[in-house]
Amino acid sequence: MPAGLHVLLLRVFGRLPVQARRAVVRLLTPSFTVGANCVIERDDGAILLVRQVYRKQWGLPGGLLERGEEPVDAVRREVVEEVGLTVEVVGEPAVVVAPEPRRVDVVFRARPLGPLPDVIEPLSPEISAVRWHLPGELPELQEEAAQALVTLARSATGEIAGRLHRLVGEPLPGER
């Protein structure tokens, strides 16, 4: 596009009402779905994984945000809906962007609040199984769950970083 035409279009765009500008931007930019997932860690280092009825591999508890919902609120809601646990979110989240299928996942670390039941049963019809898994005994993970764990490990610091790196089988920076 010639520079003069580009400038003219930007000036016209700038004169549009705010709502019209937002509509144009939404129309012309790619849209992504946004999910919130969490790594729930027990005191012994085991993490809680879920198996969805429509997938073979294991994944993290969580799901898509509802319209207007904050990611941290969505992850708390999803964990209660799927497995009946109340969790405390710990630290800063990691963000995983998947250009295809155009999805952004906000991944939190969390720990359960209150006493844990001996067995955690799925509460959602979309979850077929729920289990705690120790770091050396992880089952086959969904691709997005594996990516979330790696991203969270790479953004963590201190003792948490060591535990997450061991969980995903990746050396800490400087250990290579």
Give the ranges of each region predicted by the language model:
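Acidic, metal-coordinating catalytic segment for phosphate/diphosphate chemistry
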Residues: M1-N37
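Short connector loops at helix/strand junctions that flank enzyme active sites
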Residues: S31-G35, R42, V53, L60, ...
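Conserved beta-strand and immediately adjacent loop positions that scaffold enzyme active sites
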Residues: N37, A46, A129
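Conserved hydrophobic "DFG−1" position in protein kinase catalytic cores
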Residues: I40-E41, L49, A110, W132
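Conserved Nudix-box catalytic region and its N-terminal flanking loop in Nudix hydrolases
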Residues: R42-E81
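Unchanged
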Residues: L65-E88, V96-L152, E175-R176
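Charged phosphate-binding loop/patch that engages nucleotide di/tri-phosphates or the phosphate backbone
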Residues: V150-R176
